[in-house]
Design a protein with these regions (language model features):
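Proline/serine/threonine-rich low-complexity linkers at boundaries of modular beta-sandwich domains
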Residues: 27-38, 501-510
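Membrane-proximal extracellular "stem/stalk" segments
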Residues: 471-472, 480, 485-607
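Contiguous beta-strand segments within globular domains
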Residues: 36-62, 66-68, 521-529
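Intrinsically disordered, low-complexity Pro/Gly/Ser/Thr-rich segments with frequent PxxP/GP/PP motifs
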Residues: 78-110, 554-582
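Active-site beta->alpha N-cap acidic-glycine motif
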Residues: 127, 131-226, 233
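Terminal connector regions
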Residues: 107-134, 497, 577-615, 620-632
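Catalytic grooves of carbohydrate-active enzymes
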Residues: 58, 183-189, 263-276, 288-314, ...
Length: 634
């Protein structure tokens, strides 16, 4: 498949944006059979209440005709004509003719609102042709409504994907859209875009020389870096864009995902210092709801606002329905009752920005909100670009419509989150997931998680196998496997990554064995030797746990450094008065059991004889004492 150079794509996108603003209010439409070929209303999309109506009706005829008449009406929302004008021309050839109409809006005595222009064209020998277009009349005193546009690059991880032309094309589209997005943010700072890119994509592009499209990945990263340097905010995100509702109770996983996401951001933007992408306090939870417990973990890690879905927000009683809320988080997660601003994405408005054909309807809806008595604090629009979204060029065209209207004030996410007087809300702890993963998916993840975390604890986070297994595990938790339609059509790839992570962990930890034979102590106390054989070829740090109901274990847990080969450790125990007992010995790493054995501990025969003799001597002495005293009394 032939691909255009990046410069050509960028030029085409810029040209499309430039042309969008000059389109007429109603495109030409073919008329019925007759002399009139087409009729077009030429009008602005909006004008001020104190402005001038400068309108036109363009008529194209098929052949010469004796007479063509055009009338134009301005209809209010009830369909009542508030202004009517009529013009007629005779002896027209096969030409394009434009009827011009002009009138001061103030003379019409109309109020601000949404009106409909209706043109009717008649000609000799043909039926009337009718066309309509929308016209918004705005009062200059109307306060613009803040609109924050967050553009996210959306695609599934490439890890574990079978190489194919389709996969290569998807990767190319994603990287190209990301590059175009960076250029759009730099060339049009007035759009005040906020960007969100899953960190795993940044990591893939950072190692673009290993991918099938190295140049386009590098271009995407370079373009985003320039946008960040220009001051475009970039939201933080967890490494694999995980399903937060599914791992909400696994705090260690959440912290690991956030830490790895931050590391990927820092690696992708090494020279940005305190740029928004690196030091951002905003978080993108755009693949599903944000549970309250997850928000508390994020708040403890420096997040002050989050962009997420509306399904997890529960407005306080009496609070206005809005798209920006102040949420107080629980204090039992280290956040001390911190307040986080939640920017809830408007699904309907977001859909209007995905297609340039719907942008005018979105602008009209925003006008209605701006003119209403209950104005929103902010409207949050989230749109996806990339393989799982729309093209950046389409978003650019739609944005041009919003950027040109006076009732919309585009703001970035940090500015929207900084608004005062936000309504109060809470976050649901267990928001409903309309598209859950297939049965058994998260059980497989949980099994792999125990093994991988054990490997990381034993071998260290810098170990090659540990890092590979952890990456696979975190990617397996990605919500991207659900796909843009939520069908989880890619679930098999996520499960394959989880199983691969577990196998990597087993390949290392499975080489640790435990040999703990039965032992006879020389006395009632002693040390039980335990042999741990480490055949992994690397140094591991594990916990040696000992427990028993019949033997008193003097040290139940010992941290042990296992060097390659045999390692002998001792467990101090005491039998007390018992002659024998059983003790369980476990080798664990971060709670994951690597090996286990049961040891029988007995005291030596000589020790038991000495103990028995001592008891008999004591008993004999007591008996002699009793007999002497009783004899004297007798």
């Amino acid at each position: 498949m032939a691909r255009l150079p990046r410069s050509v794509l960028a030029a085409a996108a810029a040209l499309a944006v430039a042309l969008c603003a000059s389109l007429p209010a109603a495109a030409a439409a073919p008329a019925s059979a007759g002399p009139v070929r087409s009729v077009t209303i030429v009008a602005p999309r909006w004008l001020y209440l104190d402005g001038e109506l400068d309108l036109g009706v363009r008529v194209v005829t098929r052949n010469s005709t004796r007479r063509v008449a055009a009338s134009l009406d301005l209809l209010d929302e009830a369909g009542v004509s508030r202004w009517h004008s009529y013009q007629s021309r005779t002896v027209l050839g096969s030409v394009t003719y434009e009827y011009s109409f002009s009138r001061s809006v103030a003379d019409l005595g109309i109020a601000p609102g949404v009106y409909r222009l209706r043109a009717r064209v008649t000609s000799a020998g043909s039926p009337t042709v009718e066309r309509s277009a929308q016209l918004i009349v705005v009062d200059r005193s109307t306060h613009p409504i803040p609109v924050s546009v967050v553009v996210r690059v959306s695609a599934a991880p490439s890890a574990g994907e079978t190489p194919s032309d389709a996969a290569q094309d998807a990767a190319f589209v994603t990287a190209s859209d990301a590059a175009d997005l960076g250029r759009l943010a730099v060339l049009h700072p007035g759009l005040h875009l906020t960007l969100a890119v899953p960190p795993f994509l940044l990591q893939e592009w950072s190692g673009a020389e290993q991918t099938s499209t190295p140049s386009v990945g590098t271009d995407a990263l370079d373009s985003l870096q320039r946008a960040v340097e220009a001051g475009t905010p970039m939201l933080r995100g967890m490494y694999a864009d995980p399903d937060l509702a599914a791992i909400a109770t696994v705090t260690a996983d959440l912290e690991m995902q956030d830490a790895r996401g931050g590391a990927a951001l820092s690696a992708a933007f090494p020279s940005q210092g305190t740029a928004p992408s690196v030091a951002s306090t905003g978080f993108a939870a755009l693949s599903g709801p944000l549970p309250r417990s997850v928000a508390a973990v994020l708040a403890a890690r420096g997040v002050r606002y989050a962009v997420t879905d509306t399904s997890c927000v529960v407005p306080a009683r009496g609070a206005a329905v809005a798209e920006a809320y102040a949420v107080t988080l629980p204090s039992d997660r280290g956040s001390s009752g911190a307040t986080m601003t939640i920017l809830a994405a408007d699904r309907a408005a977001s859909g209007g920005l995905e297609d340039p054909a719907h942008a005018a309807a979105l602008a009209t809806e925003l006008f209605s909100r701006a003119a209403s008595a209950q104005r929103a604090h902010v409207v949050v629009i989230v749109v996806d670009v990339g393989a799982d979204g729309v093209r950046t060029s389409a978003v650019a065209q739609a944005l041009e419509v919003l950027a040109g209207v006076p009732w919309v004030r585009l703001v970035n996410a940090p500015a929207a989150a900084g608004a005062s007087g936000l309504p109060v809300a809470t976050l649901s702890e267990s928001p409903a997931d309309p598209t859950p993963a297939p049965d058994g998916y998260w059980e497989t993840i949980a099994d792999a998680r125990g093994r991988v975390f054990g490997l990381v604890a034993a071998a260290g986070a810098d170990d090659t196998d540990a890092r590979s297994a952890l990456d696979s595990l975190l990617l397996a938790e990605s919500r991207e496997w659900a796909g843009p339609d939520g069908s989880w059509s890619r679930a098999a790839r996520g499960l394959a990554l989880a199983r691969a992570a577990a196998q990597t962990a087993d390949s290392v930890l499975g080489k640790v064995t435990l040999d703990a034979p039965s032992v006879t102590l020389p006395g009632s106390e002693g040390k039980v030797p335990v042999s741990i054989i480490n055949s992994s070829g690397r140094t591991l740090v594990v916990d040696l746990d000992a427990s028993s109901s019949g033997v008193r274990v003097q040290r139940s847990r010992t941290s042990v450094t296992l060097r390659p080969g045999e390692n002998v450790e001792s467990v101090p125990v005491s039998l007390g008065t018992a002659t024998s007992g059983r003790m369980r010995v476990d080798v664990k790493a971060d709670g994951y059991q690597i090996a286990t054995a049961t040891v029988t501990v007995t005291a030596s025969y000589q020790d038991r004889v000495v103990l028995l003799a001592a008891v008999l001597v004591i008993l004999a002495g007591l008996l002699l004492y009793v007999r002497r005293h009783l004899g004297r009394r007798t």
